[in-house]
């Protein structure tokens, strides 16, 4: 929000409007003489005017969590009430920017202060007032038109990827008395004036919205379109939908951040909001370094991915209280773009740090701790965040649909999934991508454990698959059966060895190895495999399962005859086919293109059928 417009202590005429600091305990400050203050009201604390939020009221005492470092605040310092809740500014200029947890623009602060640190009590508006944006009003609006909350009244081309639709804030309505002609305006210029019941109100391109409040929608819709991640194991076995909720729990070093970053880079979302919440600063700088170089092709033009991304950085060395706010800031930005009719993905890395911030504040307030010292309301807070996801019919005209998908990384200490944060999260989310330390140690990435992970969106996506990839659902079921069977056989193999297994079981083991090593495993740092389009995923799986079916049939049909076909014979005769199967992943979707990859896979299937025919003859 625009902190420069908030009242300042020096400007106040009456001292009676101040409260006074009564006690300081880390980020928690208690203040007296605060009668009339509201819950979650924004306040300025001390002579440095630090930003804080009231989290408890008792008599005329208020407990405030301060979003900045509180060293130097002393008893008796003034506390100024602003009369507003913690809010964010929504308007052109969000894309490509990097904010801290309470939406202060880090690049602007850095250029103004020439410092690598954020000074305390800094006053900078979240969206720059200097940049001029090219505003085009909607053709069907003129003076005298009626307009209501959520209606789009203008369009700003924020960059070549995002057309920023300027909407009327949800609670306003009236008759247009002025609308700005097409031209260049900054975010403080009035572009619309309305009259309602004799009262005129002016609007700029920016709207302010409280972060803890859900933005209203017309209705929630069932989600039915997959969120394609470009990771084979996720798209094929545990799909998520646009508007879904996903948790990625995993111990340190399992690759949570790499999965969230590859989602940001390659998923089929229109807008990405990446919230780094209490994680390493290096991870955010890596995103800032990598994303501008990464490109995507839109209508034949190559564009930087940074143009569709906004970052909310709240690293582990920033004040603890702001971690809690950063998650709400991120989800409010996501809902704003959803209201324009975009499909938004929000990455929260990691919600465990957010829960730890809740625990620290709760401990300072001397609240009764629950499991592992987390507050009793941990589950409710997590739910209030995850339930803001979903596919919706947006408010206002023209009619449009948008969605917010949330992907939350969870880092349980020691990779223990019975941790309170993980278990509370799993009760809320619909998709669980469980990362396995053992797989990560074997350098099998993405280290998603295919036996414990699940997705509850399978049924919802059946219609989509039937329409576009008819053969896919039975293939997925078969692949899961093979992997499950291999897990059951693993114990027997350890006891008696591979040689004493039945021939069909040997085939199951070999095909499971093929699926694990050459389908589920994916090298995110190579041009051919960092992103796998869905047609390639289906083609690869289809050929592997076809090989499995043919091999089993060949073994079973000749089991009673004199010239038996065993697995060793198949392996001997089909070394070339097996090599081709395991190198299907090396086809580069950008260089080779969809048509060539599909024809290559079809050719491989034909070669396989011919090879099995000649073997049986």
Curated annotation (Swiss-Prot):
Keywords: Acetylation, ATP-binding, Cytoplasm, Cytoplasmic vesicle, Disease variant, Epilepsy, Hydrogen ion transport, Ion transport, Lysosome, Membrane, Nucleotide-binding, Phosphoprotein, Translocase, Transport. Belongs to the ATPase alpha/beta chains family. V-ATPase is a heteromultimeric enzyme made up of two complexes: the ATP-hydrolytic V1 complex and the proton translocation V0 complex. The V1 complex consists of three catalytic AB heterodimers that form a heterohexamer, three peripheral stalks each consisting of EG heterodimers, one central rotor including subunits D and F, and the regulatory subunits C and H. The proton translocation complex V0 consists of the proton transport subunit a, a ring of proteolipid subunits c9c'', rotary subunit d, subunits e and f, and the accessory subunits ATP6AP1/Ac45 and ATP6AP2/PRR. (Microbial infection) Interacts with Rabies virus protein M; this interaction promotes virion uncoating. ATP binds at residues 250-257. HAMAP family: ATP_synth_A_arch. Changing residue 349 to N: In IECEE3; gain-of-function variant leading to decreased pH in intracellular organelles; affects neurite arborization and impairs the formation and maintenance of excitatory synapses, when tested in a heterologous system; not effect on subcellular location. The modification Phosphoserine is found at residue 384. The gene is ATP6V1A. This is V-type proton ATPase catalytic subunit A. The modification Phosphothreonine is found at residue 136. Its EC number is 7.1.2.2. Phosphorylation at Ser-384 by AMPK down-regulates its enzyme activity. Catalytic subunit of the V1 complex of vacuolar(H+)-ATPase (V-ATPase), a multisubunit enzyme composed of a peripheral complex (V1) that hydrolyzes ATP and a membrane integral complex (V0) that translocates protons. V-ATPase is responsible for acidifying and maintaining the pH of intracellular compartments and in some cell types, is targeted to the plasma membrane, where it is responsible for acidifying the extracellular environment. One of its GO terms (biological process) is endosomal lumen acidification. Transmembrane segments: none annotated. It is a peripheral membrane protein. SUPFAM superfamilies: C-terminal domain of alpha and beta subunits of F1 ATP synthase, N-terminal domain of alpha and beta subunits of F1 ATP synthase, P-loop containing nucleoside triphosphate hydrolases. One of its GO terms (cellular component) is microvillus. Signal peptide: none annotated. It catalyses: ATP + H2O + 4 H(+)(in) = ADP + phosphate + 5 H(+)(out). It is found in: Cytoplasm; Cytoplasm, Cytosol; Cytoplasmic vesicle, Secretory vesicle; Cytoplasmic vesicle, Clathrin-coated vesicle membrane. It is linked to Cutis laxa, autosomal recessive, 2D: A form of cutis laxa, a disorder characterized by an excessive congenital skin wrinkling, a large fontanelle with delayed closure, a typical facial appearance with downslanting palpebral fissures, and a general connective tissue weakness. Most ARCL2D patients exhibit severe hypotonia as well as cardiovascular and neurologic involvement.
């Amino acid at each position: 929000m625009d902190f420069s417009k908030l009242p300042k202590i020096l400007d106040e005429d009456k001292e009676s409007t101040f409260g006074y600091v009564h006690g300081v305990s880390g980020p928690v400050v208690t203040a007296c003489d605060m009668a009339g203050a509201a819950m979650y009201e924004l306040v300025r604390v001390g002579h440095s005017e630090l930003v804080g939020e009231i989290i408890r009221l008792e008599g005329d005492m208020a407990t405030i969590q301060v979003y900045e470092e509180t060293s130097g605040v002393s008893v008796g310092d003034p506390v100024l009430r602003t009369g507003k809740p913690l809010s964010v500014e929504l308007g052109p200029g969000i894309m490509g920017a990097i904010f801290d947890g309470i939406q202060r623009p880090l690049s602007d602060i850095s250029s103004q202060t020439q410092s690598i640190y954020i000074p305390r009590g800094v006053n900078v508006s979240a969206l720059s007032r200097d940049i001029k944006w090219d505003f085009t009003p909607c053709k069907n609006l003129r003076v005298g038109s009626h307009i209501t909350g959520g209606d789009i009244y203008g369009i700003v081309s924020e960059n070549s990827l995002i057309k920023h639709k300027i909407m009327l804030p949800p609670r306003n309505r009236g008759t247009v008395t002025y609308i700005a002609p097409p031209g260049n305006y900054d975010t403080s210029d009035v572009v619309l004036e309305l009259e309602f019941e004799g009262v005129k109100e002016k609007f700029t391109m920016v709207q302010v919205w409280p972060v803890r409040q859900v933005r209203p929608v017309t209705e929630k819709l069932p989600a039915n379109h997959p969120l394609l991640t470009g990771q084979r194991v996720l798209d094929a076995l545990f799909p998520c939908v646009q508007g879904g909720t996903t948790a990625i729990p995993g111990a340190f070093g399992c690759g949570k951040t790499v999965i969230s970053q590859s989602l940001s880079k390659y998923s089929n979302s229109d807008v990405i909001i990446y919230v780094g919440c209490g994680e390493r600063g290096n991870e955010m700088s890596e995103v800032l370094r990598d994303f501008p170089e990464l490109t995507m092709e839109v209508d034949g033009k190559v564009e930087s991915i940074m143009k569709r991304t906004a970052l909310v950085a709240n690293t582990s060395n920033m004040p603890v209280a702001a971690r809690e706010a950063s998650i709400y800031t991120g989800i409010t930005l996501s809902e704003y773009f959803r209201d324009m009719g975009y499909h938004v993905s929000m990455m929260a890395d990691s919600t465990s740090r957010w829960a730890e911030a809740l625990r620290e504040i709760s401990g300072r307030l001397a609240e009764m701790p629950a499991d592992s010292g987390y507050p009793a309301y941990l589950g409710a807070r997590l739910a209030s965040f995850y339930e803001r996801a979903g596919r919706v019919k947006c408010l206002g005209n023209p009619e449009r649909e948008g969605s917010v998908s949330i992907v939350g990384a969870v880092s349980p200490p020691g990779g223990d999934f019975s941790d309170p944060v993980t278990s509370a999260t799993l009760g809320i989310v619909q998709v669980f991508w469980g990362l396995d330390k053992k797989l990560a140690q074997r350098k099998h990435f993405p280290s998603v454990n295919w036996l414990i992970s699940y997705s509850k969106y399978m049924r919802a996506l059946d219609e989509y698959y039937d329409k576009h990839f008819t053969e896919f659902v039975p293939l997925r079921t078969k692949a899961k059966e093979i992997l499950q069977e291999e897990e059951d056989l693993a114990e027997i193999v350890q006891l008696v060895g591979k040689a004493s297994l039945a021939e069909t079981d040997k085939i199951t083991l070999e095909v499971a190895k093929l699926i694990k090593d050459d389908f589920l495993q994916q090298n995110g740092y190579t041009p051919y495999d960092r992103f796998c389009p869905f047609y390639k995923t289906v083609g690869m799986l289809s050929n592997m399962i076809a090989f499995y079916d043919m091999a089993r049939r060949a073994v079973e049909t000749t089991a009673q005859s004199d010239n038996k076909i065993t697995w060793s014979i198949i392996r001997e005769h089909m070394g070339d086919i097996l090599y081709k199967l395991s190198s299907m992943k090396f086809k580069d979707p950008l260089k080779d293109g969809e048509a060539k990859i599909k024809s290559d896979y079809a050719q491989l299937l034909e070669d396989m059928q011919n090879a099995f025919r000649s073997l049986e003859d």
